């Protein structure tokens, strides 16, 4: 459903954000 898509997008965005932070450090 829509909620699962939102959760998947949030999880993906979270992983990308963590990877971005790791690259910055």
From Swiss-Prot:
Superkingdom to which the source organism belongs: Eukaryota
GO cellular component, one term: extracellular region
Annotated TM spans: none
Assigned keywords, A-Z: Amphibian defense peptide, Antibiotic, Antimicrobial, Secreted
Tissues expressing the protein: Expressed by the skin glands.
Compartment list: Secreted
GO BP terms, alphabetized: defense response to bacterium
Short name of one Pfam family: DD_K
InterPro entries the UniProt entry points to: Dermaseptin_dom
Family under the similarity heading: Belongs to the frog skin active peptide (FSAP) family. Dermaseptin subfamily.
Role of this protein: Antibacterial peptide with activity against Gram-positive bacteria S.aureus and E.faecalis, and Gram-negative bacteria P.aeruginosa and E.coli.
UniProt name for this protein: Dermaseptin-DI5
